[in-house]
């Protein structure tokens, strides 16, 4: 299955699909890819403009700093892979104020993480193979999988954009 498309696989395709599925990838690799998408494509500016002033900000994905620290305010995107994702609104508000940061929880309603994980597994599987030495039929399957990885990465980019637009709004508790 690829999205809404179903197709029957040959034995070779099934073997490769199983090998890819069983390939392990570090969640840090996926988080790094999310950071690349967010801070290079969706938020390419390294500064926040307020009136005529520019303010540099530190870029975080989960607990990982992306790029160099500027020492100012922080912009932190939290993915479903982070333990921080399920903390209470009250904790998010307190941490935001204490650390001088804006915290954005990417929605779990979209499948950006899974798509990037599958793409990373495909890329890692291909890197481990000496493709030019494989039979032509296997090379064709691998080329199709490379195309699938590109499609998944493009889809994930759109899903990340969607996820940042479905953020959870934190409310201060009256008290």
Q: What do these predicted ranges mean?
A:
Residues 1-175:
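Extended alpha-helical scaffold and adjacent linker segments that couple domains
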């Amino acid at each position: 299955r690829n999205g809404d498309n179903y197709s029957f696989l040959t034995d070779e395709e099934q073997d490769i699909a199983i090998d890819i599925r069983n390939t392990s990838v570090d969640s840090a690799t996926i988080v790094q890819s999310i950071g690349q998408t967010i801070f290079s494509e969706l938020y390419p500016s390294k500064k926040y403009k307020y009136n005529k002033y520019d303010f540099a900000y530190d870029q975080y994905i989960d607990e990982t700093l992306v790029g160099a620290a500027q020492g100012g305010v922080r912009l932190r995107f939290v993915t479903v892979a982070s333990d921080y994702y399920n903390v209470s609104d009250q904790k998010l508000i307190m941490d935001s104020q204490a650390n001088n940061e804006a915290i954005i929880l990417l929605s779990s309603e979209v499948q950006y993480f899974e798509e990037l994980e599958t793409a990373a597994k495909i890329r890692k599987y291909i890197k481990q193979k000496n493709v030019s030495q494989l039979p032509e039929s296997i090379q064709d399957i691998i080329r199709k999988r490379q195309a699938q990885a590109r499609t998944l990465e493009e889809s994930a980019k759109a899903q990340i954009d969607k996820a940042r637009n479905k953020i959870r709004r934190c409310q201060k508790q009256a008290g």
